[in-house]
Amino acid sequence: MNIKALEPLAGDRNFPDWNTDINISAGENVALDRWQEFQSNGLDSYDENRNFAGIDGTSRLSAHLRWGEIHPRTLLAKLGDSKAHDVFRKEIAWREFYADVLHHNPHTTWDYYAPRFKEMRYDEPDSKFNAWCEGKTGYPFVDAAMRQLVQTGWMHNRTRMVVASFLVKDLHLEWQHGARFFGQHLIDFDVASNSHGWQWTAGCGTDASPYYRVFNPIEQGKRFDAEGDYIRKYVPELTHLSAAEIHEPWLYLDGYSNGYAERVVDHAAERIESLARLSEIKADKPLDPRV
């Protein structure tokens, strides 16, 4: 079975009237200033802070790298031997690795690196996909991330994985739908990093996260936004909830008092469904495309 992903039409989405805050300075001097700031205030703790969505724990250099305002070698030249520096070095290597993979496999821009996953059963985009685009899935950590993307043109790397997993494994949609949406909004959009980052999470890429690894959007929020500050910033409907309440508003009487969206799916049930679909193609890991 060869399933072709359809590009979602912008007219099918009903975005709220959010205020857009895309105001990013550009140029080599800006990139070098940001790199200097990160070296002084974030690099040495990168390994500890890089996954927390609500803090400034990453370099925020992705757009500068994408548009050629700073070279990866400029970053590598300043790195030492500490664990934090080594973790940052590996993240730069991921970017270069994906560029090489796409160079040798150009079809993987929109096609599967592991072709077996074409055979999996997928659903067609519907109102649940629209809810994902709009940040109205009913899962606060997912919704905060999607609203951050639309409002700012950027999304934290941790939440990119979380929302990708939600689209592929909770909504059972092909990864290309999400990859195209990212391409419409990311200021740092890089074809290789985007397509293969999505395929990594979807389980069909190079050295991919196993498909059976399904990110729990509730636990991810509790772990990487424990106090809920990131959620409150982008989901004002939940600002009245405490840290203990904000990740599962459906459990509390006033969780929906400000009009927050109800859950479009039940994560526990969809996780089971996702694994059942995997068993149908009998592929618990991606296959080498040369086979």
Annotate each PLM feature:
Residues 1-116, 224-291:
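Glycine/tryptophan-enriched, flexible segments
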Residues 56-237, 243:
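Active-site-proximal binding-pocket segments
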